[in-house]
UniProtKB/Swiss-Prot annotation:
Gene: US20
Classification via Pfam families: Bax1-I (PF01027)
Family: Belongs to the cytomegalovirus US12 family.
A GO CC term attached to the entry: membrane
Compartments where located: Membrane
UniProt keyword Thylakoid, yes or no: no
Principal location: membrane
Keywords attached to this entry: Glycoprotein, Late protein, Membrane, Transmembrane, Transmembrane helix
Transmembrane parts of this sequence: 119-139, 150-170, 177-197, 202-222, 231-251, 266-286, 296-316
Protein name: Transmembrane protein HWLF3
Length: 342
């Protein structure tokens, strides 16, 4: 540091350095201004010690086991850890990566189970709808079969009885192709006769509504999962929609018998939809690979019960009115009523 001082006119210029003391001929005056010129020396960065260091992902470690320090670069004060802690952290990271791989493998196994279950379900549903369409196109003269035979309405209990058997046996229920085709034939024949007695627009509407309800409640099962709050919200929304539908149905100008049929069918469909959501949750979380057929059969029975109930709700009042001889929209009567009058 070099200091240059300037006194008043009586004083002389004096130069001094930091190595030799300053001497002046005049006393220092408080009014004399002092000019300091400081040359800032470049700060020398501390070099690391001569001991060989290792760098592991931004962490500097020392091989000394006793007083080894680890400096981890973070925002704020540096954190000092032992080299053994670094090894532990690396082991934990490796375990975390291994666990994520195991989780991915487990998810892939579940995904394959879902594919098997829903592939079997789609096969069953397509077979039943296809057989019903063949009956509807092949026997057009039997449109009044359900009108003349009220006892056939009891066949809607076939999927309900099958559901009762599957839920009663539980995990002891066999899961093989034989059981699959037994349930498939029993429910497909029932649905085919119901479709044979229905109109084309009623059939198409029932197909679309069944698929829409199945897709909706399967998606809600994935969305709700095991969260009770979500299921409470879903239940509240569904109850509001059901009450709105029943209010509109009861305020309509239909006959009181038709209103009773619509109300009973609406509650039955709600019950089957609840079972469908439960079965979907079982498929998502608790379906082992050796029980894919049984769970697919459960989903199929739920869907067939919903489909037959929709057919009964949409076509039942018409069948009842035709059996009583009520004229249709074009003024014609049914074959049964015309025969009775003649």
């Amino acid at each position: 540091m070099r200091v240059i001082s300037r006194a008043r006119s009586a004083c002389t210029w004096t130069s001094c350095t930091s190595l030799s003391p300053c001497s002046t001929s005049c006393p220092p005056s408080p009014a004399a201004p002092t000019l300091l010129r400081r040359r800032s020396l470049p700060q020398q960065r501390r070099r690391p010690s001569s001991s060989p260091n290792r760098r592991v992902r931004g962490v500097t470690t020392s091989p000394c086991p006793t007083r080894s320090l680890v400096y981890k670069r973070r925002v704020g004060a540096p954190q000092r850890l032992c080299a053994e802690t670094v090894a532990t952290m690396q082991a934990q990271e490796a375990n975390a990566l291994l666990l994520s791989r195991m989780e991915a493998l487990e998810w892939f196994k579940k995904f394959t189970v879902w594919l098997r279950v829903y592939a079997i379900f789609i096969f069953q549903l397509a077979f039943s709808f296809g057989l019903g369409s063949v009956f509807w196109l092949g026997f057009p003269q039997n449109r009044n079969f359900c009108v003349e035979n009220y006892s056939f309405f009891l066949t809607v209990l076939v999927p309900i009885v099958c559901m009762f058997i599957t839920y009663t046996l539980g995990n002891e229920h066999p899961s093989n192709a034989t059981v699959l085709f037994i349930y498939l034939l029993a429910n497909s024949l029932t649905a085919a006769i119901f479709q044979m007695c229905s109109e084309s627009r009623v059939l198409v509407g029932s197909y679309v509504m069944t698929l829409a309800l199945f897709i909706s409640f399967t998606g809600l099962a994935f969305l709700g999962g095991r969260d009770r709050r979500r299921w409470k919200c879903i239940s509240c929304v569904y109850v509001v929609m059901l009450l709105s539908f029943l209010t509109l149905a009861l305020l309509s100008d239909a006959d009181w018998l038709q209103k009773i049929v619509v109300t009973l069918c609406a509650f039955s469909i709600s019950f089957f939809l609840g079972i469908l959501a439960y079965d979907s949750l079982m498929v998502i979380f608790f379906c082992p690979p050796n029980q894919c057929i049984r769970h697919a059969v459960c989903l199929y029975l739920d869907s067939m019960a919903i489909f037959l109930t929709l057919l009964l709700m949409l076509s039942g009042p018409r069948w009842i009115s035709l059996s009583d001889g009520v004229p249709l929209d074009n003024g014609t009567l049914t074959a049964a009523s015309t025969t009775g009058k003649s």
